[in-house]
Amino acid sequence: MKKKFNLRNFIDEQYKISFSYIKGSKNFIYSTIGIFFVFSLVGFFLPIPESIATQIINYFKELVSKTAGLSLPEMILFLFNNNSISGFMGLFFGAVFGIFPVLSSIANGFVLGFVSNTSVHQDGIFSLWRLFPHGIFELPAIFISFGLGIKLSTFILVKDKWKTFQKFFINSLSVYIFVILPLLVIAAIIEGTLIYLGA
């Protein structure tokens, strides 16, 4: 007799698989965190060419123009779409030698450092506390995505490449759906609300 599908048991099992895979991938995630924070320090302390600074500022100006006039639900959806796409690409494009998640960690860390430096110069050191709520859920989700993206690329190093890739891919997909996306939903709600209220 065919066993009846139980949604709750399925979800519980997926969470167990997801957290077990994250735990087994912690060194890759820690590496991503390390890359991110090293380049955030670079962005904060080292002067950068004016052309790069202008590009970063223009990027944020473009984001502001895109979100101007959005309602709170629209703002939340906009942020969630951006972050979920970034997380997806960082994870699954990592299959190509881990290049995309590494470069994304470098770029995101550098931009955070630059923005933090600009904020401190304009509003003082305590202005950094305003940035904290924006990243409390988003950054862990992105670190997990990028870390698993780097791990996904290591299938090329083992003997049974295709089987290993399938295993990594399926586990990564489970983590993306059951861990990363929920974190990004919470992050979008918090960040969207803060932006909407002008915090």
Spans of model-derived segments:
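Interfacial helix-loop-helix junctions of multi-pass membrane proteins
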Residues: 119-135, 188-199
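Conserved mixed alpha/beta catalytic, RNA-binding, or beta-rich assembly cores of soluble enzyme
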Residues: 104-121
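N-terminal signal-anchor transmembrane alpha helix
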Residues: 22-53
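A structural-propensity feature for long, helix-poor, extended segments
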Residues: 132-155
